[in-house]
Amino acid sequence: MGRLLCLCSLVVVLLAPACAPEAAATDPIARGRQVYRELGCANCHEASLSNFFRPVGPPLNEIGRIAPKRVPGLSAEDYLRQSITDPGAYVVPGYPDSMPRGLARDLSTADLAALVAYLASLR
């Protein structure tokens, strides 16, 4: 019984950090990755069982490379920022205009900049 209690205690101690809320990252790209996860962006932009392996929104795994080519005259960062703040301004062909409106309203200026930096880093 003592060994079992000791083993259970060890498991709790080892798993506790994994269950704790993630501390806010200070690196903009790391913080952007955190914001991406917190907002649930992967639910629509990554293939999964829930969306039958085809993302609802365009995949973002190489968006940093693709973004500068999407809208002539917009840098990758400007395109990404516009896609978050005004999602209907440009809709990727083959995908519905389903990006949530008002998403940027819920983001601080720093979190929006971090999210843009993270997305721009995906190549």
Language-model-detected regions and their locations in the chain:
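Bacterial lipoprotein signal-peptidase II cleavage site
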Residues: 20-27
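C-terminal capping alpha-helices of c-type cytochrome domains
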Residues: 20, 99-123
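Gly/Gly-Pro-rich "capping" loops immediately C-terminal to redox-active cysteine motifs
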Residues: 29, 33, 46-85, 100-105
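Short, hydrophobic secondary-structure boundary micro-motifs
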Residues: 53, 92-94
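Bacterial N-terminal signal peptides that target proteins for export
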Residues: 1-8
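C-terminal motif of bacterial Sec signal peptides marking the signal peptidase cleavage site
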Residues: 15-18
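Generic structural signal for secondary-structure transition and capping sites
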Residues: 41, 88-92
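The canonical Cys-X-X-Cys-His
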Residues: 32, 38-48, 115, 119
